[in-house]
Amino acid sequence: MPLDDRKKKILYAVITDYIMTAEPIGSRTIAKKYNIGLSSATIRNEMADLEEMGYLEQPHTSAGRIPSDKGYRFYVDSILRNYINNEPPISYNTREEIIAEFDEIVKKYAKILANITHHTTVAKMPKLNPDRIKRIQLIPVASNKMIFLVVTDTGIVKNYLLNLCQNVDRTIFEFLNNLLNEKIAGKNEKDVFEFLQQDLRHMLGEMVFIADELINTILLSLKQLQETDIYADGTSHILDFPEYKDLSKAKNFFNLLDNKSLLNEILEPEVDFIDVRIGSENKFEEMKDLSVIKTTYKINGRVVGTIGIIGPTRMDYRKLINEINVMTKELSNLLSNIYNDEI
């Protein structure tokens, strides 16, 4: 049975008030605070109907009502249907990020989102397999130290510090740069492994002393580029919500954030736009009292990761949907600009 305009107005009033106060609301309060144009008695009857239809709940013996997950879902769907981003773009100085690693850029944006929303944010860094190494660069920082820089064909940057057992002059660095880019750049994983295991030591000749460091670092970079990394920020914000003054609930929330494999599944993108999962809609028991708003970020149109906001079902969905949308658009634009030449 579809909701008529009267029921919609009352449902939205209950949700709006509960988001702000965390307290059940009664018909008299709605009549006084919200310009619905209905008497308290009429509102009371409509609220009883909404409860019977599953959109509202009556906690314990309270005279007031609170939204159910079904009520939140109706509210969120109406937001997403009518969603227009009227907020100005977030101004952000990208100069520092351009020299940062990919995952550090994403972490910084997740931190900003947590600070803006006062909610816990989680970010999923990409699993890049089967991406290939596009470029390797060895940068000397001392005669016995160098930075090993890896750039993938999606522009992801990883760097490692190598400590060498002997001093190496710059001509050797140039030789190694040319050799590794010739033999590894653009090759698939199988060819890279074969080169490392069968050919590298022979090609290094008198420089074989550097072989173990190079082989171990290249293998480590390949392994890490195939792993999904999960980052969380603003974890303490959950304690600002009255629902989580209960220490056992707070403990369960922090245990959830420690479960990286579970967060990985929670952040798995299911739609190409903003995805909202409310309370009981989540398939994991640990998320039954929580909602997650998640969306993907991209490099030149290609999805490379996910960012989400996790909090109580009593969250300001309209505000948070707008903020995560603006932030991920900014992040996608920045990443696309930085890595445009690398793809």
From Swiss-Prot:
**Record keywords, A-Z:** Repressor, Stress response, Transcription, Transcription regulation
- Does this UniProt record's set of keywords contain Transcription regulation? yes
Which is one GO molecular function term here?
DNA binding
Q: A single GO BP annotation from the record?
A: negative regulation of DNA-templated transcription
Q: Which InterPro entries match?
A: GAF-like_dom_sf (IPR029016), HrcA (IPR002571), HrcA_C (IPR021153), WH-like_DNA-bd_sf (IPR036388), WH_DNA-bd_sf (IPR036390), WHTH_transcript_rep_HrcA_IDD (IPR023120)
Give the similarity note: Belongs to the HrcA family.
- Protein name as it appears in the record: Heat-inducible transcription repressor HrcA
**Name of the coding gene:** hrcA
